[in-house]
């Protein structure tokens, strides 16, 4: 039996939910049936499948789908038992040309080719919508001294492949892949991937849309990017209605307003019209109708979120007439509705203000075929600019990676979550508002922290324990670190289509500003793995705010900081002013271990794609050698450091092995480990090797050579390797990890002696980064002296680079700010990860209480 609960309260409206949960080794076998039980001991069907396996073949992670009514129970349990039949099932039928999904409340027919992915949407046997064509507007520029000419060309989607990925009975998923095609030249550009998700009994569709960039962005600019739906609405203009979700509720109007000079807001039917009641002319009100039908018909209406703090609503009577401003607001909830006598459609875009600019538009509302467009990048503002910020690399002055200019967006992606709901009647404001809230923060079922911890399915980390005074102090500091970044996202407005989810690298206390404009000090791009810190913080706490930040960071870093096609496919881009700007393209940024927990917790299929994408990322190093600035090509195809390169490969291979049980990826891990075992210094060798992806072999070049020993451990290698140690049953591998952790803390003299003179203090920078590995060594050796060294690395300010307490200062500059003058995301991420590990491994060896409540950090 497993206890599960809602991440943030039960949904207010009926919702389809997919979630994941871990299992102890041997606890769940293939073929075991699972059922869901609520607090009233009522059992229901849950669609279940494995998403990862233990080495013995038992199930490590499962993925589940179920439909929950509004005001559901707060908690549930999952049991191993015979599964009851689902009360509602969907059906799916595939033909040569289309795929039809019938949820019982909605019938959706999906094209397998052409421009529109939805052939029809039907409610109660009647069509309500169709289309679903993707729209991209290309901008090209011709500039002279006297003028600039902008050319805007419209392109629409062309479907290349549509396939059923899940077929029920509770949940169905259809994956669609294609490109945009320009009208005039038929040129293809901007590949896309869309998944449509359906749940039994629901008249909703979830869309996960991924836009890939296949151009450099130097000559062609994306002016607009959206998805357009056709509506089949019935009724007169005065019975056509729109709704937009503002900050608190719905703004609503009809296409033709019946407030007139003679019959104003005091007229009793006027309020009914505004509230969406259908009007029928009769003898009593015929004069009102006669006046009202002479009013302007407002055919087009849109809401544009042009910054994280401003949206505007406007309307016009047609494309040949001016837009009239309606209202302004701060942060819209990203939902619009258009409907008539026969019902209508609601569309929603998640992260509507966070990933500005964004827009929702209704055109031709009063006509025979209205359109609704969800703009991921609205054409109202500036075109998307993917160019680099400079013509130089600024390596020496600004911490850029290489002298080579490799700032290229080709291969990056951006994924967005869109929702669509169909109605056979006018929905109430309460229903639409509940939908808007649900679509912005989708309901999710999670486990209690002790379930994650006891499963041992997530590597090495500690459960929260405040029984010891210093443990309590450290938990307060871990919480303070997270809260600082949570507030900083809002304070610094780290929002935007290409930015949301990321944080900045290093702070400038003189300008009271992050180094947003200084080469490698700007966006973090997963450097020193803050994503791992956030996921471990969530597993320990179960907190929604931590989950949401980890989710946003995972979505951003896995898509925008990584490359999915082109020369750098499988790699990611190091920290820079522009997310794809650094000359370093590295496996450490895109490694599976940074993203797999989101996949396991949510069952997100797009993230599953990304884990598969990187399984053979080591081959990308043949074209982009990470050590090309230091070494010429040798006998073997490329070079790799044990960390971060080979450690990232291990992470990728582990994810592929546990997800698919493909033992070839286990062999790749074992091959590298065995290469290291044969060397006198084992894991301390190198750290740079010649590498052959065809054999997965590391070829020794020497010890203490270029590569940097702190680089081995700063990018998630300890977390990956300790997780592997739990799985491999290889005592020598465990001993190698222990040896590395102990060696980092030795004196210079001891390092030279133990390595035969090859290694010394000059090779081992940033010892705090090794605190977790040192704690691992202390635990394995039962060595209190080593444990004391590890804690000293974390608690002594000069070594930890994290002055305690973490207590922001309030200052007055161009505005009032809270700041940590010393802060870098590198050190905070690593300090938190190493503290979390040390609390697990040597939590019983804590020193006397350290005072962290007086001085400012």
From Swiss-Prot:
Disulfide bonds listed in the record = none
Output the InterPro entries linked to this UniProt entry. Answer: PcRGLX/YetA-like, PcRGLX/YetA_2nd, PcRGLX/YetA_3rd, PcRGLX_1st
Show the stretches that span the lipid bilayer.
none
This one is known as Uncharacterized protein YetA
What's the source species' lineage? Bacteria, Bacillati, Bacillota, Bacilli, Bacillales
Gene for this chain: yetA
């Amino acid at each position: 039996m497993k206890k599960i609960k809602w991440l943030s309260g039960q949904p207010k409206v009926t919702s389809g939910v997919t979630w994941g949960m871990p299992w102890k080794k041997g606890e769940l076998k293939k073929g075991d049936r699972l059922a869901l039980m609520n607090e009233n001991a009522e059992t229901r069907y849950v669609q279940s499948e494995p998403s990862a396996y233990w080495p013995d073949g038992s199930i490590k992670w499962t993925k589940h789908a179920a439909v929950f009514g509004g005001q559901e129970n707060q908690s549930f349990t999952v049991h191993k038992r015979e599964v009851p039949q689902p009360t509602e099932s969907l059906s799916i039928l595939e033909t040569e040309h289309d795929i039809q999904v019938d949820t019982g409340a909605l019938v959706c027919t999906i094209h397998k080719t052409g421009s529109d992915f939805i052939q029809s949407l039907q409610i109660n046997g009647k069509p309500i919508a169709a289309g679903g064509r993707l729209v991209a507007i290309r901008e090209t520029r011709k500039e002279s001294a006297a003028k600039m000419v902008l050319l805007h060309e419209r392109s629409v989607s062309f479907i290349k492949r549509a396939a059923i990925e899940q077929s029920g009975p509770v949940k169905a998923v259809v994956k669609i892949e294609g490109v945009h095609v320009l009208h005039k030249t038929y040129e293809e550009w901007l590949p896309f991937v869309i998944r449509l998700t359906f749940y039994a009994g629901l008249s909703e569709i979830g869309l996960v849309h991924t836009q890939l960039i296949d151009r450099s962005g130097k000559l062609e600019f994306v002016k607009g990017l959206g998805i357009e739906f056709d509506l089949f609405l019935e009724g007169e203009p005065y019975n056509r209605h729109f709704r937009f979700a503002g900050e608190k509720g719905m703004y609503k109007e009809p296409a033709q307003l019946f407030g007139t000079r003679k019959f104003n807001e005091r007229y009793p039917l006027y309020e009914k019209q505004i509230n969406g009641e259908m009007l029928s002319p009769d003898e009593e009100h015929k004069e009102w109708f006669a006046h009202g039908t002479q009013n302007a018909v407002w055919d087009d209406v849109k809401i544009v979120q042009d910054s994280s703090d401003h949206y505007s609503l406007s309307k016009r009577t047609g494309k040949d007439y001016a837009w009239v401003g309606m209202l302004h607001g701060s942060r819209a909830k990203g939902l619009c509705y258009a409907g008539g006598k026969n019902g209508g459609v609601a569309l929603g875009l998640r992260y509507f203000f966070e990933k500005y600019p964004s827009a929702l538009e209704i055109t031709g509302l009063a006509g025979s075929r209205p359109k609704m467009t969800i703009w991921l990048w609205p054409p109202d503002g500036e075109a998307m600019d993917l160019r680099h910020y400079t013509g130089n690399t600024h390596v020496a002055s600004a911490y850029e990676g290489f002298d080579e200019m490799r700032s290229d967006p080709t291969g990056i992606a951006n994924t967005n979550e869109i929702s669509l709901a169909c109605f056979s009647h006018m929905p109430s404001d309460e229903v639409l508002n509940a939908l808007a809230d649900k679509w912005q923060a989708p309901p999710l079922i999670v486990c209690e922290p002790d379930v994650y911890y006891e499963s041992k399915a997530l590597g090495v980390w500690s459960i929260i324990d405040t029984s010891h005074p210093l443990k309590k102090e450290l938990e307060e500091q871990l919480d303070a670190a997270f809260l600082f970044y949570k507030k900083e996202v809002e304070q610094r407005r780290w929002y935007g289509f290409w930015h949301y989810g990321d944080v900045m690298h290093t702070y400038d206390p003189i300008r009271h500003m992050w180094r947003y404009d200084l080469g490698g000090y700007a966006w973090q791009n997963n450097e020193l793995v803050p994503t791992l810190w956030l996921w471990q913080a969530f597993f320990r706490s179960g907190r929604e705010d931590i989950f949401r930040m980890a989710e946003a960071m995972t979505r951003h870093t896995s898509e925008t900081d990584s490359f999915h096609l082109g020369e750098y496919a499988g790699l990611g881009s190091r920290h820079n002013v522009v997310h794809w700007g650094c000359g370093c393209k590295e496996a450490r940024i895109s490694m599976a271990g940074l993203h797999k927990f989101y996949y396991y917790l949510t069952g997100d299929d797009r993230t599953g794609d990304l884990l598969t994408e990187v399984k053979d990322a080591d081959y990308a190093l043949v074209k982009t050698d990470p050590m090309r600035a230091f070494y010429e090509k040798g006998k073997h195809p490329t070079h790799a450091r044990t960390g971060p390169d080979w450690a990232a490969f291990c992470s990728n291979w582990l994810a592929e092995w546990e997800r698919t049980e493909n033992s070839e990826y286990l062999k790749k891990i074992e091959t590298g480990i065995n290469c290291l075992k044969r060397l006198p210094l084992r894991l301390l060798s190198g750290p740079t090797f010649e590498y052959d992806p065809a054999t997965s072999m590391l070829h020794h070049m020497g010890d203490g050579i270029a590569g940097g020993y702190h680089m081995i451990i700063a990018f998630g290698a300890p977390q990956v390797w300790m997780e592997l140690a739990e799985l491999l049953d290889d005592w020598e591998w465990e001993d190698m990890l222990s040896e590395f952790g102990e060696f980092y803390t030795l004196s210079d003299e001891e390092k030279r002696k133990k390595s035969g003179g090859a290694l010394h203090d000059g090779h081992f920078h940033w010892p705090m980064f090794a605190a977790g590995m040192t704690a691992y060594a202390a635990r394995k050796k039962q060595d209190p002296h080593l444990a004391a060294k590890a804690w000293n690395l974390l608690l002594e300010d000069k070594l930890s680079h994290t002055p305690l307490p973490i207590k922001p200062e309030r200052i007055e500059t161009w505005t009032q700010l809270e700041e940590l003058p010393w802060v870098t995301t590198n050190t905070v991420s690593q300090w938190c990860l190493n503290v979390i590990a040390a609390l697990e491994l040597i939590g019983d060896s804590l020193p006397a209480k350290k005072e962290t409540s007086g001085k400012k950090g």
